[in-house]
């Protein structure tokens, strides 16, 4: 059961992400699974200054709001990810400065593994989703499909989505994603990436991946 304490915690985390400059004004949205329901930032809300009146409580299975607050226009992919990924409890759609700049590049990076933090925390493969209208069924379908096996995606000319087990993991993924994109942009394209062997080494010794 969702309590006022849950709502207060959700709002505090929304403000934390805003303070980190992961989104501005009404850009971005956030969701948090609690049992069979989810807290979702409401449509038109400003996540950095989110208030209780703009927090929607939705049934994950049906998507129906339980408290009369309409959820974000992107709630379809939030709920879709939560349905498909029982290991995921938090989903964040954000538009940080450099990562969004990369999403608007004509020639987007095929590889974001500029530092060890990317394969270790963000994902060694980050799918790039074509542009679809925000809030559209096509965008929701593409995001949910991509995030069945990935924890981070780039949305062309739009932004980014990351998911994780809790607020801290999502914060970490979003922050390191932005860091990688800042390196890519500020390098002017003159940057190196980790080799597959170096990534595998990190996965074994940092993430504990078993060797074949």
What are these regions (language model features)?
Residues 1-212:
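Glycine-rich flexible loops
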């Amino acid at each position: 059961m969702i309590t006022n304490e849950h709502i207060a915690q959700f709002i505090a985390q929304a403000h934390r992400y805003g303070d980190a400059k992961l989104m501005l004004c009404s850009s971005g949205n956030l969701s948090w699974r609690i049992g069979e329901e989810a807290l979702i930032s409401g449509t038109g809300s400003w996540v950095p200054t989110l208030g209780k009146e703009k927090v929607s409580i939705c049934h994950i299975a049906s998507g129906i709001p339980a408290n009369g607050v309409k959820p974000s226009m992107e709630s379809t992919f939030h709920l879709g990810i939560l349905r498909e990924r029982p290991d995921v409890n938090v989903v964040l759609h954000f538009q940080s400065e450099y990562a969004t700049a990369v999403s608007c590049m004509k020639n987007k990076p095929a590889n974001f593994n500029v530092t060890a933090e990317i394969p270790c925390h963000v994902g060694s493969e980050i799918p790039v989703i074509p542009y679809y209208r925000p809030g559209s069924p096509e965008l929701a379908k593409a995001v949910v499909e991509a995030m069945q096996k990935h924890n981070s995606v780039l949305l062309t000319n739009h932004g980014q989505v990351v998911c994780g087990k809790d607020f801290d993991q999502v914060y970490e993924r979003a922050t390191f994603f932005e860091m990688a994109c800042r390196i890519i942009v500020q390098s002017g394209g003159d940057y190196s990436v980790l080799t597959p062997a170096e990534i595998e080494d990190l996965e074994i010794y940092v993430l504990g991946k078993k060797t074949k």
